[in-house]
Amino acid sequence: MIDKAEIMDESAIMRAITRIAHEIIEKNKGVDNLALIGIQRRGVPLAKMIAEKIKGVEGKSVPVGILDITLYRDDLSMLSEHPIINGTQIDFPITDKKIVLVDDVLYTGRTVRAAIDALMDAGRPKMVQLAVLIDRGHRELPIRPDYVGKNVPTSRLEVVNVKLYEIDGVNCVTISDIEKGVRH
């Protein structure tokens, strides 16, 4: 898949992360009783980046968890006969906490629906909010993010690629055309 355009470079990503962190602090009137949970895979480094920015502003650490939604997806049978399970790691109680789910791209809303199902199996949060780096539209479910790094209108024939240093060795967001015969 060849990138046809870079829509965010590292500086733009960091500005968006900083803004999201400030918006989270403002909306929640601080960070007491707050936790971030990154959706595997690229939501995890984003959650860590947001937590670092929050710590820099508030002087308090916010717990960060990892949520694997693989077994909660409604397209599991289409993914693979043997899906790769990365594992959920939430080392703190989520019951009665304000949880901010973090993901890289919001598209149809199905990933977030699966994440909410997985989260509810882990406890009963006081509130669940959603932070995404990219909102590309095309929702199939009534899901709306609370915090957005950038709105990027796309066609269904395009794919948004978020590349993060922790996984990809570079921080940027690009758009590519979907290859014929490949379903995204």
Swiss-Prot record:
Gene3D superfamilies: 3.40.50.2020. GO terms for molecular function: RNA binding; uracil phosphoribosyltransferase activity. GO terms for biological process: DNA-templated transcription termination. It catalyses: UMP + diphosphate = 5-phospho-alpha-D-ribose 1-diphosphate + uracil. It comes from the Bacteria. Its EC number is 2.4.2.9. A motif (PRPP-binding) lies at residues 99-111. Pfam families: Pribosyltran. InterPro entries: PRibTrfase_dom, PRTase-like, PyrR, PyrR_bifunctional. Keywords: Glycosyltransferase, RNA-binding, Transcription, Transcription regulation, Transcription termination, Transferase. Homodimer and homohexamer; in equilibrium. Belongs to the purine/pyrimidine phosphoribosyltransferase family. PyrR subfamily. NCBIfam families: PRK05205.1-3, PRK05205.1-4, PRK05205.1-5. HAMAP family: PyrR. Regulates transcriptional attenuation of the pyrimidine nucleotide (pyr) operon by binding in a uridine-dependent manner to specific sites on pyr mRNA. This disrupts an antiterminator hairpin in the RNA and favors formation of a downstream transcription terminator, leading to a reduced expression of downstream genes. This is Bifunctional protein PyrR. It comes from Acetivibrio thermocellus (strain ATCC 27405 / DSM 1237 / JCM 9322 / NBRC 103400 / NCIMB 10682 / NRRL B-4536 / VPI 7372). The lineage of its organism: Bacteria, Bacillati, Bacillota, Clostridia, Eubacteriales.
